[in-house]
Amino acid sequence: MRCPKCDHNGTRVLDSRPVQDHYSIRRRRECEKCGYRFTTFETVEQTPLIIVKKDGNREEFSREKVLRGIIRACEKRPVTLEQLEGVVTKVEQQLRALAQSEIPSEQVGELVMNELARVDEVAYVRFASVYRQFKDITVFFKELEDLMKQENSTN
């Protein structure tokens, strides 16, 4: 690692510790020549996740886009931003665990709904109503019934 101050190629690591996401390491370094101390981050290189939309178009997975949709579903609900970011992180981890370069958008939506149901049932129903494009009230009621059956079977 080159020193950013004197460009010397020799540095030593003073301290290493994982960053909160556990995919990065923070290192404190010191230049062997000038003694300048600086911080570096080592991060796992992630291959991009490509989402195949319903119309066949492809786009890179966007945490921000998923988070915006979840935030909309959780308006005026007692859910923290930290919880919502946790949902997005879990969804992204599940997508990466699939080890597929291309993933259908339907699969992303299902994963989001599964995680959201664990956080807030009302937000889940809101998200599902937009995602699944309920055409009438009977489909909406069926989704509620399924959710209630699922809840009763876990209790």
UniProtKB/Swiss-Prot annotation:
Q: What does this protein do?
A: Negatively regulates transcription of bacterial ribonucleotide reductase nrd genes and operons by binding to NrdR-boxes.
Q: Which GO terms describe its molecular function?
A: ATP binding; DNA binding; zinc ion binding
Q: Domain ATP-cone, which positions? A: 49-139
Q: Provide the cofactor list for this protein.
A: Zn(2+)
Q: InterPro entries of this UniProt entry?
A: ATP-cone_dom (IPR005144), NrdR-like_N (IPR055173), RNR_NrdR-like (IPR003796)
Descriptive protein name: Transcriptional repressor NrdR
* Zinc finger feature spans (unnamed): 3-34
Q: Which domain of life is it from?
A: Bacteria
User: Highest lineage ranks of the organism?
Assistant: Bacteria, Bacillati, Bacillota, Bacilli, Bacillales
Tell me which UniProt keywords the record has, alphabetically: ATP-binding, DNA-binding, Metal-binding, Nucleotide-binding, Repressor, Transcription, Transcription regulation, Zinc, Zinc-finger
Task: State the Gene Ontology BP annotations.
Answer: negative regulation of DNA-templated transcription
Q: How is the cofactor bound?
A: Binds 1 zinc ion.
The family note in this entry says: Belongs to the NrdR family.
Q: What organism is recorded for this protein? A: Exiguobacterium sp. (strain ATCC BAA-1283 / AT1b)
